[in-house]
Regions:
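A short acidic, amphipathic alpha-helical/loop segment
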Residues: 124-129, 146, 150-151, 233-237
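Active-site metal-binding loops of divalent metal-dependent hydrolases
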Residues: 78-80, 116, 142, 192-195, ...
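Cap/insert and terminal regions of metallo-dependent hydrolase folds
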Residues: 2-13, 110, 136-138, 142-145, ...
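Metallo-beta-lactamase
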Residues: 1-104, 139-226, 245-252, 303-325
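Divalent metal-coordination and catalytic microenvironments
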Residues: 67, 77, 115, 122, ...
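Active-site metal-binding motif and surrounding structural segment of the metallo-beta-lactamase
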Residues: 89-139, 143, 154-156, 242-248
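Glycine/Thr-rich phosphate-binding loops of Rossmann-like dinucleotide-binding domains
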Residues: 84, 121, 147, 199, ...
Length: 329
């Protein structure tokens, strides 16, 4: 078993942890910046790669990215629900619709699931992907039981720094994943450390692990940081993977700092994480879709610009995408 697991629960090696549940009511007395009920989004299919070597990364919203490659299509933390909470009628309401409709998604070969929080793990979406595409679900230790409850069958559970070479052939009984897959190309997925916590209820805290993923396609590397506070693990990511082409880094849900600092980075910390991992380019995520904390929906992007300037980083090196917008590698 993992060296960051003890007495039935996972933990962050540096001692960081979320605030205890009994402190959550204090959030009711914080000042919340206003959010709109809805922000218009133009939903459209994502553009396909124009060549076998091109990778297209589309921001669907929050922590959901569609990564299209000729080696197979990948989706991260897919959430298409209207609320990020249990039962479908509780939890923060979505204010930006997904940039790509579920029915417009291309065939998905891999689903990457960073942890079990409702804004990252939507069982209805996972169930729909399982039914439609029979993809392989790659997650962290302790999450398989939850996924099986949604009918998911092809599950790979990884510990931090564990690598899974990804076979592109469908398992027996599964339908073909993608007719445009290039034979012989391979995707490698490595679980990476994050500083966070897990819980679906008040009674299962840290029973399942959290993390991020490094996606290696040929010699190109895309880092999906998952949900994380700032910590020394980012330097370790950069040490283990010295040629990251693109990093997807959370920049939102960070106020108030007394409650969020250990588990969510603010934009200044996100810029430092970008520097630590040594990415050629980073794209911000985890903002402007669900009202999780007290800052306004647009403040993370504005603060990212200020932090980028203060650090002397070129504007193009760490950007954000509009919901539904794509970047090409």
């Amino acid at each position: 078993m993992s060296d960051h697991f003890d007495n039935g629960r996972f933990f962050n090696p540096n001692g960081a942890d979320a605030q205890p549940f009994w402190k959550a009511p204090r959030m009711l007395f914080e000042h919340y910046a206003p959010w709109p009920a809805q922000v218009p989004v133009v939903q459209r299919p994502s553009p396909p790669p124009t060549s076998s070597d091109e990778i297209v990364v589309t921001f669907i919203g929050h922590a959901t990215f569609l990564i299209q490659t000729s080696a197979g299509n990948i989706i991260t933390d897919p959430v298409f629900a209207q609320r990020a909470g249990p039962f479908g009628w509780t939890g923060p309401r979505r204010v930006r619709q997904p940039g790509v409709r579920f029915d417009d998604l291309p065939p998905i070969a891999y689903v990457l699931l960073s942890h079990n929080h409702y804004d990252h793990c939507d069982l209805e979406t996972l169930r729909a992907l399982q039914h439609r595409d029979h993809p392989r679900f790659v997650t962290l230790q302790g999450n398989a039981t939850l996924l099986r409850s949604a009918g998911v069958t092809r599950i790979a559970e990884l510990d931090w720094w564990q690598r899974m070479p990804a076979e592109m052939s469908a398992m027996p009984g599964a339908q073909t994943l993608d007719p445009v897959v290039t034979p012989g190309r391979e995707i490698e997925i490595t679980a990476t450390q994050a500083q966070h916590f897990s819980a679906r209820t008040p009674f299962d805290r840290n029973r399942a692990l959290w993390g991020g993923f490094m996606i290696t396609i040929d010699e190109r590397q895309i880092y999906f940081a998952g949900d994380s506070g700032y910590g020394p693990h980012f330097l370790e990511v950069g040490r283990r993977f010295p040629r990251i082409d693109l990093a997807l880094i959370p920049i939102g849900a960070y106020e108030p700092r007394w409650f969020m600092k250990d588990i969510h980075m603010n934009p200044e910390e996100a810029v430092q994480a970008h520097i630590d991992v040594g990415a050629r380019r980073s794209i911000g995520m985890h903002f402007g879709t669900f009202r999780l904390t007290t800052e306004g929906p647009n403040e993370p992007v504005a603060a990212l610009g200020r932090a980028r300037s203060a650090a002397g980083i070129d504007d193009a090196a760490f950007t954000t995408l509009d919901v539904g917008e794509s970047a090409r590698l």
